[in-house]
A protein has these predicted regions:
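Conserved SAM-binding loop of SAM-dependent methyltransferases across substrates and taxa
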Residues: 84-97
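Active-site capping/gating segments
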Residues: 176-218
Length: 218
């Protein structure tokens, strides 16, 4: 009798219905293609844990869009620590008006991001294999984004040298957002940040609220 090899395999979360109507057919098709790539290769390539497939759409793909309303039209965006592509690739799929720079230090993740950009035909996206600190002084952006990269006290000194005057750091954060802000007071003063706010966001296709931290330069 052969063993059931699928018994311990995690299930893959199905996409919510109505995506084509909400995002438009082209963007929805790319989101689904990206999801399939992650289902097929995410665990094998060390991009997502196997159990993350059980909440791929709600926790990762759609959750990334909580920051989309905070990004102005035709903005330049730097995504620090893009990893598997959250939120940078997701933003690129739904916002073709943006110019997006994905910043990632790990070679295998850089290779993955380059493959995704090519396969999904995202000409408005560039991938940089470097640390954010190395890009400082070479380029400046309207918005810097980040998700699950570092606490704010570390993220702020990486992000603010990359921002244009009046630019904004927009970060996806969890329950510790207030604590992270308190712990980052020294960096907030150092970089003359005049506004740090927390926003609770509902995201289409999910039942969970997401917290977004926005910090503005003077």
């Amino acid at each position: 009798m052969s063993a059931d090899l699928t018994h311990n395999q995690p299930s893959v979360e199905a996409p919510p219905s109505g995506g084509a109507s909400h995002f438009g057919e082209p963007a929805w098709a790319k989101l689904c293609s990206f999801a399939t790539m992650l289902e097929d290769e995410g665990d094998m390539r060390g991009l997502l844990g196997p159990r993350e497939l059980e909440r791929l759409w709600s926790r990762h793909l759609l959750n990334s869009l909580a920051i989309e309303p905070d990004i102005p039209a035709s903005a330049s965006v730097a995504d620090i620590g893009s990893g598997a592509g959250f939120p940078g690739i997701i933003l690129a799929i739904v916002r073709s008006d943006l110019s997006i720079c994905l910043i990632e230090t790990m070679d295998r993740r850089v290779q993955w991001l380059e493959e995704v950009v090519k396969k999904l035909d995202l000409p408005h996206v560039q991938v940089f294999n470097m640390r954010a600190e190395e890009l400082a002084g070479q380029a400046h952006f309207d918005v810097v984004t980040a998700r699950a990269v570092a606490p704010l006290k570390k993220l702020i000194p990486w992000a603010f040298p990359l921002l244009k005057p009046a630019g904004a750091l927009v970060a996806l954060k969890g329950a510790r957002a207030e604590i992270e802000i308190d712990e980052a007071r020294k960096m907030i003063r150092k970089f003359s940040i005049n506004s740090v706010t927390i926003h609770e966001r509902s995201v289409w296709g999910t039942d969970e609220a997401t917290r977004v931290v926005k910090a503005y330069a003077v």
